[in-house]
UniProtKB/Swiss-Prot annotation:
Pathway: Polyol metabolism; glycerol degradation via glycerol kinase pathway; sn-glycerol 3-phosphate from glycerol: step 1/1. It comes from the Bacteria. It comes from Staphylococcus aureus (strain MRSA252). Disulfide bonds: none annotated. GO terms for molecular function: ATP binding; glycerol kinase activity. This is Glycerol kinase. Glycerol binds at residues 82-83, 134, 244-245. NCBIfam families: glycerol_kin, PRK00047.1. Its EC number is 2.7.1.30. The phosphoenolpyruvate-dependent sugar phosphotransferase system (PTS), including enzyme I, and histidine-containing protein (HPr) are required for the phosphorylation, which leads to the activation of the enzyme. Coiled coil: none annotated. The modification Phosphohistidine is found at residue 230. InterPro entries: ATPase_NBD, Carb_kinase_FGGY, Carb_kinase_FGGY_CS, FGGY_C, FGGY_N, Glycerol_kin.
Length: 498
């Protein structure tokens, strides 16, 4: 009887369940979208119960549709949209407010106040993060401050906090396990990434009671078992957890110091494994925990690009220049260059290494000879320039020259982007056969804990190259193009909203 690992990939817009066999191949997929709530400008929320219902639905569907029995599931791994915050009543199991999503800016005033009080460096030193609404800590404070009776309930020990991984493990285990893993804890602004403990000083600054917080565990461990009524009468080990970007790093078998993966999703995320050393960034990168396994943690440097694949969606839905995302490649390759056109897609500001929330998108270098093809090509190239910005910051902070770049996410199917990426960073770009690396990473973590895979070496053998893109551009051309990009970014920052 063939066994599988079930991976739950709980994302920002949908929940997916994917079955993996021992070779790390996909044996079945189910997906379900859920509703986004926008109660005010800049606020983004989810209904945590809707997320839970969607997860139950995809788990059921992937098992039924692929004629797999529940007793063929050796373990469950969970990967999740990071930072999204749930606070619930531990007796009733009901959330006391919507889940506040990572994108939501509703805690901006809390962050500003803490900065004015001079605590920014304290948070940076202990957590490796910026004092930004992006992270979970200020979201918990906001819920306790704004939901009637919440703070009193929290002080009395009646409320629990969790990121989405914690919420799902708690529900799946029938309320038995209130846990998170090192990678998710490191995104909360409340966890000391050096001591590997919840930090009392930070909790005091955020006025969050410690009794609400989950126990922090390794990313690969049996945390508990599914309660039988949620899983066809079976008690299946819940055995792996990691935040989405860290799971992708693991799924790409980036186990060695200096290994790098880049995800081209709606936004872009680059992570470098820095081994057992938490590298302090001087270049606007985040220092975070990659994963905890075998009794130790691996750290990572992370760079965030706010607009990556969503720039292609903009060409399709906003400007109607293309009918489908793949069409962008054929337009881009009809011309040999952009003829000096640069698109800076700072639609929601600029991420790493600039961290400029006031910047807005801009186009430079237009002439009467500029055609649609030049514009589309310039938009695709912007994904690659932004990646070089992040990679240079990583090399500078870590002292490691990146030897190859493993890639995943929707935009990696675009061969033009992959080749231009290799050219502009002067590094080989490696596209794997299995591009569901986030779900695969969670599966690997769970599989290691239950003996489905023996070791990381076992997993590394599963990684297979689909195509390698080597740099072909000469040095002079590469640097000239990149200088133009830097100039365009600088000009974009000059032209800010008032």
């Amino acid at each position: 009887m063939e066994k599988y690992i079930l991976s739950i990939d709980q994302g920002t817009t949908s929940s997916r369940a994917i079955l993996f066999n021992q070779k790390g191949e996909i044996a079945g997929v189910a997906q379900r979208e859920f509703k986004q709530y926008f109660p005010q400008s800049g606020w983004v929320e989810h209904d945590a119960n809707e997320i839970w219902t969607s997860v139950l639905a995809v788990m059921t569907e992937v098992i039924n549709e692929n004629d797999v029995r529940a007793d063929q599931i050796a373990g469950i791994g969970i990967t999740n949209q990071r930072e999204t915050t749930v606070v619930w009543d531990k007796h009733t199991g009901r959330p006391i407010y919507h889940a506040i999503v990572w994108q939501s800016r509703q805690t901006q005033s809390i962050c500003s106040e803490l900065k004015q009080q001079g605590y920014e460096q304290t948070f940076r030193d202990k957590t490796g993060l910026l004092l930004d609404p992006y992270f979970a800590g200020t979201k918990v404070k906001w819920i306790l401050d704004n939901v009637e009776g919440a703070r009193e309930k929290a002080e009395n020990g009646d409320l629990l906090f969790g990121t989405i991984d914690t919420w799902l493990v708690w529900k799946l285990s029938g309320k038995a396990a209130h846990i998170t893993d090192y990678s998710n804890a490191s995104r909360t602004l409340m966890f000391n990434i050096h001591d590997l403990e919840w930090d009392d000083e930070l909790l005091e600054l955020l006025t969050v009671p410690k009794n609400m917080l989950p126990e922090v565990k390794p990313s690969s461990e049996v945390y508990g078992k599914t309660i039988d009524y949620h899983f066809y009468g079976q008690e299946v080990p819940i055995a792996g957890v990691a935040g989405d970007q860290q799971a992708a790093l693991f799924g790409q078998a980036c186990f060695e110091r200096g290994d790098v993966k880049n995800t081209y999703g709606t936004g872009g995320f680059m992570l470098m494994n820095t081994g057992d050393k938490a590298v302090k960034s001087e270049s606007g990168l985040l220092t975070t925990i990659a994963y905890g396994i075998d009794g130790k943690v691996n750290y990572a440097l992370e760079g965030s690009i706010f607009v990556s694949g969503s720039a292609i969606q903009w060409l399709r839905d906003g400007l109607r220049m293309i009918n489908s995302a793949p069409q962008s490649e054929s337009y881009a390759t009809r011309v040999d260059s952009t003829e000096g056109v640069y698109v800076v897609p700072a639609f929601v500001g600029l991420g790493t290494p600039y961290w400029d929330s006031e910047a807005r998108g801009a186009i430079f270098g237009l002439t009467r000879g500029t055609e649609k093809e030049h514009f589309i090509r310039a938009t695709l190239e912007s994904l690659c320039y932004q990646t070089r910005d992040v990679m240079e910051a990583m090399s500078k902070d870590s002292g490691i020259d990146v030897q190859s770049l493993r890639v995943d996410g929707g935009a990696v199917k675009n061969n033009f982007i992959m080749q231009f990426q290799a050219d502009i960073v002067n590094t080989s770009v490696e596209r794997p056969e299995i591009q569901e690396t986030t779900a695969l990473g969670a599966a690997y973590l769970a599989g290691l804990a239950v003996g489905f895979w023996e070791s990381k070496d076992d997993i590394a053998k599963n990684w297979k190259l689909e195509e390698k893109f080597d740099p072909k551009m000469d040095e002079g051309e590469r640097e000239k193009l990149y200088r133009g990009w830097k100039k365009a970014v600088e000009a974009t920052q000059v032209f800010k909203t008032e």
